[in-house]
Amino acid sequence: MTTAKEPSASGKSVQQQEQELVGSNPPQRNWKGIAIALLVILVICSLIVTSVILLTPAEDNSLSQKKKVTVEDLFSEDFKIHDPEAKWISDTEFIYREQKGTVRLWNVETNISTVLIEGKKIESLRAIRYEISPDREYALFSYNVEPIYQHSYTGYYVLSKIPHGDPQSLDPPEVSNAKLQYAGWGPKGQQLIFIFENNIYYCAHVGKQAIRVVSTGKEGVIYNGLSDWLYEEEILKTHIAHWWSPDGTRLAYATINDSRVPIMELPTYTGSIYPTVKPYHYPKAGSENPSISLHVIGLNGPTHDLEMMPPDDPRMREYYITMVKWATSTKVAVTWLNRAQNVSILTLCDATTGVCTKKHEDESEAWLHRQNEEPVFSKDGRKFFFIRAIPQGGRGKFYHITMSLSQPNSSNDNIQSITSGDWDVTKILAYDEKGNKIYFLSTEDLPRRRQLYSANTVGNFNRQCLSCDLVDNCTYFSASFSHSMDFFLLKCEGPGVPMVTVHNTTDKKKMFDLETNEHVKKAINDRQMPKVEYRDIEIDDYNLPMQILKPATFTDTTHYPLLLVVDGTPGSQSVAEKFEVSWETVMVSSHGAVVVKCDGRGSGFQGTKLLHEVRRRLGLLEEKDQMEAVRTMLKEQYIDRTRVAVFGKDYGGYLSTYILPAKGENQGQTFTCGSALSPITDFKLYASAFSERYLGLHGLDNRAYEMTKVAHRVSALEEQQFLIIHPTADEKIHFQHTAELITQLIRGKANYSLQIYPDESHYFTSSSLKQHLYRSIINFFVECFRIQDKLPTVTAKEDEEED
């Protein structure tokens, strides 16, 4: 018999299980829990939104409402920085010019300003420049000014009694309504000189007939008291080549003779049926240089002309005069530099005998830099301070203040270094003899900054920074001191909007603002200005500074084109905390580019070892350093590798042309396009003083000149777009450079464009032409950076198959 058992759950039939599942009651929803969860989610979301709002900077909220910087802005009054051109004339007074044009005298002790010249008077005379006589009785105005080179000009001059006198023309006795090359007051009373046809005229006071005191001038050939082209551009860096003694009794002047210097002819294509030419003396590498001599004439009594004797040194067979400065009323300091520019001698010359005594000698295996520096003297002339390069360890020499003290009954001077360290003194400003202090600008803070310092000239030479943290958003300064040293004018040049303030020297306290350029601050605040970043890159044991300009709306997730801007003239500085609004600003603000600059080997203010690295091999190391800067930027995710460009002008044009064909790490093209403005392409075609300074004397060993030709580089140009811009009447870098370059580009079948400016000079004096120039450069890079839509192309064969 079989016993019946109760079936187990596992033994249930599939049908029974399905019936149970189907027939079971659904669970009740937990509505209360769902509501709580939703509430928590809403609270979290609101907290996130609140955090985002609170943490977002206020300026970002309004950024989209701000305007972008345009080319028009660069030339508008809103962006025009006003420099009051303040100048101390006594212990407590300075002269300055207001924005509306009125010239005033300000007394810092009484805090009272007096009108000297009404702005409307300057307007009525159409005057470009003005100068007040030392006795404040007369003003000298120039009008109808016509530029010659970078600094020089000709113009008509009038004298007018302050404040409301009628203008009277300033002319040589033999000519009326003459266009003068120069006119300016002396240090005392109403004495003045002017230069006409390269001859010097002296007037003891207004109303007295001028007398010609130097008459050896010959137009375009022999210059008295003025620079020729080479001295103006490369040596003295000014058109003025005369110097008053402190008491006004003597005048030192240079005579520059161009008679043996080859002539360059600048063509003028417009304005006549046949082109005309403007000839002028321009010494190229290896050619005859101008000769120079220094003379002193007495202005009281019969004119006596005495030449200062150059050093009796075989290394000085050919020389430049790079600096002249009066020490006393009878002693004048002169720096003589040999043609190779590797030996300089500082002398103190007796203006009554012409005998010059050597005070200091400097020599370099490369070249001597900063030879225009003026020493600062004590009142008796026995003590003076000058800047010289002093060894500071592995980075080579840096420029520091040396004090020289003449010993009684001894031909040897006692020399002491006032400053030291791996930073540069950039300028000596003043010596306070009573307080035993020297005032100067330096890069001690950072190479890209200029701060105002003082140092004791006795004891342990303690120094103090006077400008550090003194003015908000300002780290780049220049300054000038009152005659008593009790007050100083402090000029902020960046990174904020430039301004001028007046301070008490004792406690650095700001007394008042002279100029704040509020209109520019407002314009800047209303625009999408670039964000500025600084960083260092390491190359061959050097830390090289780099400046990066990013759009105001920058985000890491956007891809931006990269524009490398190069200058790199040996000893120059591209990375500096100075205020600037330029066409590069427009590229960043309006067109979303990232602009980068780098101070590589050959740049200044980082020691002579780095400076002299480029000797006899210009372009080679600069290319390496600039390419490293580009590679550093290409590692950033926000840079578009397919849109990289380079630009340079003058020497920078040489570098941009040199760098453009450079290959990347994978041997592909790095740059999409490049542009060069007035590029140097062959240094034997350029100014003797410049080329010979860095490449040696042409004719002795020309290998450096051959190696640095860009012709060797442009053959590697492939499909990159290349824009060359050059004015045809460029007096500094002749169009010949571009003509030589284009010849090589045609041979190499390169893709280039040329834009010329007929009959325009190197410095583009016309604002309308400058606007056109900037637009041309910007449009070229905007087109280069344009992202083209790549549509699939259909070949003829495929077209036939479809048919």
From Swiss-Prot:
Q: Which residue intervals make up region (Disordered)? A: 1-24
Query: Which regions span the lipid bilayer?
Result: 34-54
PTM annotation, UniProt: N-glycosylated.
Task: Provide Extracellular-side residue ranges.
Answer: 55-803
Q: Which PANTHER family match?
A: DIPEPTIDYL AMINOPEPTIDASE-LIKE PROTEIN 6, PROTEASE FAMILY S9B,C DIPEPTIDYL-PEPTIDASE IV-RELATED
One GO cellular component assignment for this chain's record is: plasma membrane
Extract the Gene3D superfamilies matched here: alpha/beta hydrolase, Dipeptidylpeptidase IV, N-terminal domain
Q: Which pairs of positions does the record mark as disulfide bonds?
A: 349-356, 465-468, 474-492, 673-784
| Pfam families reported for this sequence | DPPIV_N, Peptidase_S9
Cytoplasmic-facing ranges: 1-33
Has the keyword Glycoprotein been applied to this entry?
Answer: yes
Organism this protein belongs to: Pan troglodytes (Chimpanzee)
Question: What's this protein's function?
Answer: Regulatory subunit of Kv4/D (Shal)-type voltage-gated rapidly inactivating A-type potassium channels. Modulates the activity and gating characteristics of the potassium channel KCND2 amd KCND3. Promotes cell surface expression of the potassium channel KCND2. Has no dipeptidyl aminopeptidase activity.
Source lineage:
Eukaryota, Metazoa, Chordata, Craniata, Vertebrata
Q: What is this protein called?
A: A-type potassium channel modulatory protein DPP6
Biased-composition ranges for Polar residues?
1-19
Per UniProt, subcellular location reads as: Cell membrane
Query: Which InterPro entries does the record associate with it?
Result: AB_hydrolase_fold (IPR029058), Peptidase_S9_cat (IPR001375), Peptidase_S9B_N (IPR002469), Serine_Prot_S9B/DPPIV (IPR050278)
Q: How would you summarize the oligomeric state and partners of this protein?
A: Homodimer (in vitro). Interacts with KCND2. Identified in a complex with KCND2 and KCNIP2. Forms an octameric complex composed of four DPP6 subunits bound to the KCND2 tetramer. Interacts with KCND3; this interaction modulates the channel gating kinetics namely channel activation and inactivation kinetics and rate of recovery from inactivation.
Membrane topology, record value? Single-pass type II membrane protein
**Entry-listed glycosylation sites:** 111, 257, 342, 409, 473, 504, 751
